[in-house]
Structures are given as C-alpha cells and as structure tokens.
A protein has these predicted regions:
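N-terminal pre-domains immediately preceding structured catalytic cores
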Residues: 2-185, 193-292
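A conserved hydrophobic position in a structured secondary element of the catalytic/binding core
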Residues: 190
C-alpha cells in the first residue's frame, strides 16, 4: 500500500520532466525556425506565438537572445560614456517586444540598451477600460513615488495610466506597471534579472535629480510603412497621432513637450538640454502640432 503513492509520485515526476523537455524542444525548434513560420500567420497569432516562446524561455531559465550582458553594466556604461544617475528616458515597442533605455549625454539622450520584453497582454492598441487586460500606449511621466521596491513582481514602476489624454477620453484602469517576472494582465513584464538593471538606472536618475522620466509607449516602430499598412484600422488614427512626438525625439534626441488639446495629443520640440521631467498638460497652443 505504501509503495503505490511513491510509484505514482515517481510517475508524475517522469511525466513532468518529459513534458518540460518536450516543451523546451518545441520552443527551441519554433525559435530556430521563426523566420519561416511567422510571415504566414495573422499578426495577433504572431504575437501569441512570440509570447509563448518568451514565456517558455523564462520558465526554463533561459536567456532570450539579444538580452544585454547584465553582468557587465559598469563596463557598458563606461563604454557609452555615461554613469548611473544620468537622466533617463524609456521607450516601449509592443509589436517588437522591446523596451529601450536612453541616457542623457550632454544636451541629448542616447540609446543605452534595448531589453526584450518577456510578456505584455492584449492586442496592439491602447488600453480603454479597467479589466480589458490591455497594455497602454501613449506618453507617460514617472516620478519617484511610482517606484515600488517591494513589488509582487520583484520591482516595478507605475506608468501613470490613465494620463491626461486617457482621462479626456474617459479611459479607466490603474496600477499599470513595468515590472519583473514574466506574467502580465496589462503590464510590461521584463524578468527579474532585466528589471534589476532597469531599476538601477531609473532609480539612479531620480535620485540624481531628475524629477520624472518620460516613457513613450508605441504599438510598433512608427515607420511610414508600418503606419501605412495599418491605415484604416480601428486604431490607425490614434497610432498616427503618436508619430509627431515619436519623430521629434528621433530627430533631436530631446524629449518632446507633450500636452493634450481637445482630447488629442499635441507636441512641441523640447528645449535643448531638457530631461523630460515636464508633466503632461491639458492646454492648447498655436505652436502645438495637434493630431488625434
């Protein structure tokens, strides 16, 4: 009688190990052949496929290809000519599963690192209401009070959703984070290892005197081709509205001044040397570029 439970436990362990190995093999095969598989799938299926691969990697303790060398932060900072404490700016690209950290060097920001996002939830498009499990898109500012060193998901910072633009459109939700781990119901999960480095950089910037850092969240790389291929979709106009702010930063390396006018994002070029600390304002100006 006492041997039966032991045999069942051993059987379940063998089954679990086999399942883990098969999952790992399938994940390795899928990733190795992703260039052949992905072009034939609808975009939302491609996104689900990407999530599955990344969650599989994380569950097996593997490092996703393209992850920065997290053991060489000091050397990477030295090579870039910057230090912990430099003002920071964050950009997120959902479709590419990438989070970028930009650090201020002189009067401009320069891209320091690109981190693969482990998981975000929902589809491409903005968060609209509480419980829709959407990860937001738009322009946000993050201050010291938004940082949580004791997060359920290791460490986190609150994006500040809903911002003035979201509130103008009566979008609802709360506690939308960038955090560790690899689970999401509306947040951006980065794994604990990556979040440790991201945390060090953003906290260092805030401790060093930056009041807030700008976080720009885009559905995908806002190239003309990417926008044209999605023109006429439900979110096409909203995505087009993000491009002026995206392009101002690309062109100048200075965070744009962001405001909301008539429920629409509006952008002005940031002053030379600005660090992106300015909060989102609700105001209209003759100088602002107004697009939805």
């Amino acid at each position: 009688m006492t041997d039966a439970p032991r045999k069942r436990r051993r059987s379940w362990r063998r089954f679990a190990l086999l399942l883990l190995l098969l999952t790992g093999a399938a994940g390795a095969f899928a990733i190795a052949n992703r260039g052949y598989i992905l072009p034939f799938l609808p975009e939302q299926d491609v996104i689900r496929f990407e999530r599955w691969q990344r969650v599989t990697y994380a569950s097996l303790g593997w490092t996703w290809p393209g992850t920065p060398d997290l053991n060489a932060l000091d050397q990477r900072l030295a090579a870039a000519g910057v230090k912990v404490g430099a003002p920071v700016l964050v950009r997120i690209f959902k479709r590419e599963f990438e989070l970028e950290i930009w650090l201020k060097k002189g009067d401009r920001f320069e891209r320091f690192a690109t981190y693969p996002i482990c998981k975000w939830s929902g589809r491409l498009g903005p968060k609209v209401r509480q419980g829709d499990r959407q990860a937001p898109e738009g322009f946000y500012t993050v201050g010291g009070k938004a940082l949580n060193p004791n997060s359920r998901w290791y460490r986190s910072f609150n994006l500040g959703f809903p911002n003035a633009h979201d509130r103008a459109l009566r979008r609802s939700g709360s506690f939308i984070m960038v955090h560790g781990g690899c689970s999401s119901i509306g947040c951006y999960a980065m794994t604990n290892a990556q979040m440790s480095e991201i945390w060090k950089l953003v906290k260092g910037a805030l401790d060093g005197g930056q009041q807030r850092f700008q976080t720009q969240v885009f559905p995908f790389r806002l190239t003309d081709a990417n926008l044209a291929s999605r023109a006429g979709t439900a979110d096409g106009d909203f995505w087009q509205s993000l491009k002026p702010g995206h392009d101002l930063f690309e062109q100048t390396g200075v965070p744009p001044r962001v405001s909301v006018c008539n429920k629409r994002y509006a952008f002005e070029a940031g002053n030379p040397g600005a660090d992106g600390s300015a909060e989102l304002e609700t105001r209209c100006s003759a100088r602002t570029a107004k697009v939805n």
